[in-house]
């Protein structure tokens, strides 16, 4: 099971959207992927993200590479993961 693959649901661990869940829509190169929330579900805008800023979960939806936000939203609703995607995760910042 590859951790970084199209359709994998991840948690953003860095940045202003830290703690929000997103879906990998496309793999750009070895370091970056294209993700979306979609924004109206989890608050994550469609954008390029460094893979070091993502924590993959065990959940995956079946979408095509480059799927639109509407297609992603439809698949999330079909899988019954809408409430799961809306949940925010509390990120623990290590203290020095």
UniProtKB/Swiss-Prot annotation:
GO biological processes: ribosomal large subunit biogenesis; translation
InterPro entries: Rib_uL2_dom2, Ribosomal_eL14, Ribosomal_eL14_arc, Translation_prot_SH3-like_sf
Species this chain originates from: Saccharolobus islandicus (strain M.14.25 / Kamchatka #1) (Sulfolobus islandicus)
Organism superkingdom: Archaea
GO molecular function per UniProt: RNA binding; structural constituent of ribosome
UniProt entry keywords in alphabetical sequence: Ribonucleoprotein, Ribosomal protein
Family to which this protein belongs: Belongs to the eukaryotic ribosomal protein eL14 family.
Recorded GO CC terms: cytosolic large ribosomal subunit
Protein name: Large ribosomal subunit protein eL14
UniProt cross-references to PANTHER family, sorted A to Z: 60S RIBOSOMAL PROTEIN L14 (PTHR11127), LARGE RIBOSOMAL SUBUNIT PROTEIN EL14 (PTHR11127:SF2)
Gene: rpl14e
